[in-house]
């Protein structure tokens, strides 16, 4: 369960951070 969440976070967090901070 945790490895799955870590994988999803690793995939989506950079995109969310990029959209929020406007730093890509």
Curated annotation (Swiss-Prot):
Compartments, record wording: Secreted
Protein name in UniProt: Brevinin-1Bc
Primary role: Antibacterial activity against Gram-positive bacterium S.aureus.
Cystine pairs: 18-24
Lineage: Eukaryota, Metazoa, Chordata, Craniata, Vertebrata
One Pfam family of this chain: Antimicrobial_1
BP-aspect Gene Ontology terms: defense response to bacterium
Any one of the GO CC terms: extracellular region
Family according to the record: Belongs to the frog skin active peptide (FSAP) family. Brevinin subfamily.
The species this protein was found in: Lithobates berlandieri
Principal location class: secreted
